[in-house]
Amino acid sequence: MKRLTALLLAAALALSLAACGPEGKAADTVRYGLSNAWDALMPYNSPSGSNYSRIIYDKIYDRLAYVHADGTLEPRAASSWESADGGTAALFHLDEKAAFHDGTPVTAEHWTDTIALLTDPACPTLGRSAFAVLSGTDDTGAAVPGEALGAEAVDKYTLKLTFKTPTTPEDFLLDKNREYYVLPTHLLEGTAPEDVMELALWDEPVGSGPCKFVSETPGSQLVLEANPDYQLGAPGFDRLVITVIDKSNLLTSLIAGDLDYYAFGGNVSVEDAEVARAAGLEVLEGTVPNSFYELMLNNETIPSAAVRRAIDLALDKEALCLHTAQGLGEPAASDLTPGTGYDSGLTWARNVDGAKALLAEGGYDGRTYTLACTANRSGLAALMQQELAEAGITVTIETVDSATLFAGMADGKYDMAIASHTPGALPLWFTESRFTADNNLFHVKKGRYSRSPMAKATKR
């Protein structure tokens, strides 16, 4: 089994909010690093839907449950749940101690009002597709006029969700829990659905999660404080300072004591592992794939399936793995993580001559494509640029932050962009979450669907 050297810190345990309890000892200020910025503080208005944004939402806002990596569930906003109506509905018994940061109790009505707002076709949310599993919605998650919406407040603290097909509460939570946050709808009264996303409230958000908003320097730093009244107990710190810092500065920042924890991208090279050990940091090796890299393609600016396939064949994924994971990666031939139960057994092989033939077939005219990447992937982008040039494809690189990258893909500004995600229980999560009517990053036109090839490599 291939192995990846990964750097882990004991400080990470202090931020495992699932383990927070009233007996947690305050740790004053915890300094937390991210390699990319969040793109919104409103959880249903994120162009990227990335973990860099979700990690922020999970602290400010609350979800129904915790879903652990092994698929087990623990209460969060809901203290318990059960099936109803022969398996077509689920009852969530909300924690009666839960409250928004302004002191207002969180009720089932807040949940139903949140869902009603976001399924309203007039509301310009980017997260509507998550509600398409509920009865009374169409395939995009928009409420169908004249039909009862599958979100009901049975009583003050009981939320009932009704599904289009029989679904256990556990299956629903495994699939959609990360998409459902309760909003302070009592602060939205009198606001038209089409105006909700523009409210100043989202600049200084009020949630019901374990941390309260203090201040933000957009794209650079976010300061939160512990919520002493959180129903599961206050986090074990007083203040949390989240700073965007380049991945190349990870080790030096940790060693210098400028950071206590670094989320996402905490892997170190084999060479840097010795530096980390020498500084007294514990270095562990893992065998589970922890990064999945994608080259997202704009199907509107690259309309030919032959040209898109040529891009896939022109890339040397072995070289990309060597660059990104010091050879501890594995090329992928599809959206599915190799070696998992969902893997179809497809194999990959580079074929530059085949790519050239497909370019001719697709009528590629030598135009220059724009490839967007974040700073920590600039080396990977340069290698892709070189490999594509060997097949005759001209690419220029634009280095931007994560929020700009995903917004640019959504707006059609870029022809291609490098992204990555952490593989999980849902094998098509990355593609599905960015391929919806409201957030079609691949720009696949209705009625002209063809699978958007994304050059993939997994890192273990």
Spans of features found by a protein language model:
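A structural "hinge/loop" feature
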Residues: 34-55, 77, 104, 170-183, ...
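N-terminal lobe/hinge region of extracytoplasmic solute-binding protein
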Residues: 33-85, 206-207
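Surface-exposed binding/hinge segments that line
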Residues: 131-189
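Ligand-site clamp/hinge motif
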Residues: 227-272, 394
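Extracytoplasmic/peripheral linker and loop segments enriched in polar/acidic and small residues
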Residues: 309, 321, 343, 396-405, ...
